[in-house]
Design a protein with these regions (language model features):
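A glycine-rich, hydrophobic loop/mini-helix early in the fold
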Residues: 1-25
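Short glycine/proline-enriched loop/turn "hinge" motifs that connect secondary-structure elements
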Residues: 9-14, 84-85, 125-126
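Contiguous, small/hydrophobic- and glycine-enriched helical/loop subdomains that border
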Residues: 16-59
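Short loop segments at secondary-structure junctions
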Residues: 23-27, 74, 98-101
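Long, positively charged amphipathic alpha-helical accessory segments at protein N-termini or as interdomain linkers
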Residues: 49-51, 86-196
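Beta-rich nucleic-acid/ligand-interaction surfaces
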Residues: 55-75, 173, 177
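Aromatic/basic-lined ligand-recognition segments
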Residues: 73-81, 89-91
């Protein structure tokens, strides 16, 4: 799957949770404000844990950025954004289960294989696999993606959000199917190029 925000690749598997916040309006919310809202939401979700969550770039992680989230200097999440029709979408991937350092090693190997030692105009990160970890590792407890989804719901409720369980409309379903088909086609093209 190719995500539609951010600049570099991230690992998306069953142990990673993605959350998106959509801010309506072209100019009412700045990118930094939207990032800060996501950061504060994550802090709220984990307020019962005895940890400090920091936001600053972890340079030797994959997809480094100034809104990397870390505990004890190890990145477990990254926030990205993109402009969407009528607003801003802020997206976060949370490395919940498994090994964050193994995911980082996989991305390091991916870049090394893709670059084949060539110099490029764009600078790719020099990934240190030990710069990343999962929440499971950092919190030193068994935590699953589903647990974090419940933490998200509880945090939103505590913050006064109203959660609506509206069914998907026919128009939304058709758009989803169209986007899904485009993603399948795009991924097939990438696989074809990789098989050469």
């Amino acid at each position: 799957i190719v995500r539609n925000s951010g600049g570099l690749g991230v690992v998306l598997d069953q142990g990673v949770l993605n959350i998106s916040l959509i801010f309506k309006g072209q100019t009412e919310t700045t990118i930094d404000e939207a990032f800060t809202v996501m950061y504060l939401l994550i802090c709220k979700m984990f307020e019962d844990e005895d940890v400090d969550i920091h936001t600053h770039e972890i340079e030797q992680s994959y997809c480094p950025g100034k809104f990397d989230l870390s505990i004890d200097g190890k990145k477990f999440a990254g926030i990205s954004q993109r402009r969407v029709r009528g607003g801003i979408a802020v997206q976060i991937y949370l490395c919940v289960e498994g090994s964050g350092s193994k995911r980082a090693a996989m991305m390091r190997d991916f870049y090394q294989h893709a670059l084949k030692g060539e110099t490029t105009k764009f600078r790719f990160p020099n990934i240190d696999s030990e710069s990343m970890a999962s929440l499971e590792t950092l919190l030193n407890k068994d935590i699953k993606v589903q647990d974090v989804m419940f933490l998200l719901l509880y945090a939103l409720k505590d913050l006064g959000a109203q959660l609506n369980m509206d069914p998907v409309t026919e128009d939304e379903w058709q758009r989803y199917e169209g986007y899904f088909e485009k993603m399948i086609e795009r991924n097939a093209k990438m696989h074809q190029k990789l098989d050469l």
